[in-house]
């Protein structure tokens, strides 16, 4: 279906024809744990990866399969794996690349949960991380070590929507024989396709824009199919005979889908962060309206940013669409159709004023999620990034008066009126 536009692909990929068993137009929910094999030879072929298809519900499901094919197509990848959450998608990706003493070079301005995962949790599994200013390409390249196994970025940093130069960083990573991993949760494939700029693996918290309605947890790993795992010589679990799967080389068995096949067959098999068929179904409902929602998110965000930038009670707005933002040129390069509907601003005052502003909003919901059709707000320093030290918060540009907004699809007049009520409470 590659000849079709994004808006058509988001509706049809993975189910080009009605369901063969029922003729249903909507993707059915295949609520089953297991699958019947035709005979013993068929079962052996499935387990040997010589016949593609369902083996067991922890690994695959037909509803999940449609979601995976659709997201792979939308991102321009070869294959995808859907898992139980965005955190699982990121964890599996890093573990697959860097287990047993590997090292990651990561952008420092990332989601607090991902920062904590890399800085603390994964160290117990022998994985270390150096956090760098992704705008300083020399610093990033100098951080690469002999045991480095990947470079990790976000298309739009969390929470300040800063933007790395993906093309330039991809060139550095590839020159050192490393894959570039990009979290495109905030970007979405509708606004930016990182694979077209050199990314090798793209991850998502599908809980956010992909689902879009604050109802469903899920994560996605998309394999570009472009990285040469054998040539690099750094990934024997993927490229060489793997003793955990009766000597299979995933490169030989799965070709360009080797990376996600390895995660599915080994990590997902053994640790089981499986997405439920129902969650896969709900995320598919979100995918079908992705472009429509993102257009409205972008339209509303532009107007909110303009409003905040002129407000006398606002100290600073961190949004790359503003001409004085340090990433404005990168924003115009990578996001020509707008975006960055999750961003921060600094209210005049401190933490007390920030909390009072938030507590007097009515339409904006105070919660930890983002990228919902409903507008959302939170105080990062005391919530999503509260695990960080004072020094780490400062390093990531998060201050006591920083407020994060996630702009929804409500009528813009109501959104701005609600923000005005928050400001009125602290006059």
How does the language model describe each region?
Residues 2, 18, 80-311:
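Conserved PLP-enzyme active-site core in the AAT-like
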Residues 2-61, 69-70:
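N-terminal "arm"/small-domain region of PLP-dependent enzymes with the aminotransferase-like
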Residues 156, 185-187, 322, 348, ...:
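Active-site beta-loop-alpha junctions enriched in small/polar residues
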Residues 222, 344-346, 406-408:
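Short hydrophobic/aromatic beta-strand micro-patches
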Residues 271-274, 278-280, 285, 289, ...:
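Conserved small-domain helix->loop->beta segment predominantly found in fold-type I
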């Amino acid at each position: 279906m590659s000849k079709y536009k994004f808006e058509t692909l988001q509706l049809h990929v993975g189910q080009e024809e009605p369901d063969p068993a029922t003729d249903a137009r909507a993707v059915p929910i295949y609520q089953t744990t297991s699958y019947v094999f035709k005979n013993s030879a068929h079962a052996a072929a499935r387990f040997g990866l010589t016949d593609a298809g369902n083996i067991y519900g922890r690994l695959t499901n037909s509803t999940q399969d449609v979601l995976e094919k659709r997201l792979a197509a939308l991102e321009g990848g070869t294959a995808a794996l859907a898992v139980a959450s965005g955190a699982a998608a990121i964890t599996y990706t890093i573990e697959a690349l860097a287990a047993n003493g590997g090292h990651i070079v990561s952008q420092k301005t990332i989601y607090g949960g991902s920062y904590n995962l890399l800085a603390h949790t994964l160290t117990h599994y022998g994985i270390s991380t150096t956090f760098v200013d992704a705008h300083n390409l020399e610093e990033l390249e100098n951080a690469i070590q002999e045991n480095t196994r990947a470079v990790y970025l976000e298309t739009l940093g969390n929470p300040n929507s800063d933007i790395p130069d993906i093309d330039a960083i991809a060139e550095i990573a590839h020159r050192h024989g490393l894959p570039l991993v990009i979290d495109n949760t905030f970007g979405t494939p509708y606004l930016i396709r990182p694979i077209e700029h050199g990314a090798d693996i793209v991850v998502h918290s599908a809980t956010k824009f992909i689902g879009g309605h604050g109802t469903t947890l899920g994560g996605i790993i998309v394999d570009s199919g472009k990285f040469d795992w054998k040539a690099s010589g750094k990934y024997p679990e993927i490229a060489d005979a793997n003793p955990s799967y009766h000597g299979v080389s995933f490169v030989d068995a799965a070709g360009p889908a080797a990376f996600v096949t390895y995660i599915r067959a080994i990590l997902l098999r053994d640790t089981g962060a499986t997405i439920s068929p129902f969650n896969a179904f709900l995320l598919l409902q979100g995918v079908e309206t992705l472009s429509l929602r993102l257009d409205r998110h972008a339209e509303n965000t532009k107007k909110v940013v303009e409003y905040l930038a002129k407000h006398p009670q606002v100290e600073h707005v961190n949004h790359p669409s503003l001409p004085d933002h340090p990433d404005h040129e990168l924003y115009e390069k990578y996001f020509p159709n707008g975006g960055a509907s999750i961003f921060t601003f600094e209210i005049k005052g401190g933490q007390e004023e920030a909390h009072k502003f938030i507590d007097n909003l009515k339409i904006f919901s105070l919660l930890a999620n983002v990228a919902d059709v409903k507008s959302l707000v939170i105080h990062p320093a005391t919530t999503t990034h509260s695990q960080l030290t004072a020094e780490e918060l400062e390093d990531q540009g998060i201050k006591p008066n920083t407020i994060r907004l996630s702009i929804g699809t409500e009528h813009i007049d109501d959104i701005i009126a609600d923000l005005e009520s928050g400001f009125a409470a602290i006059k």
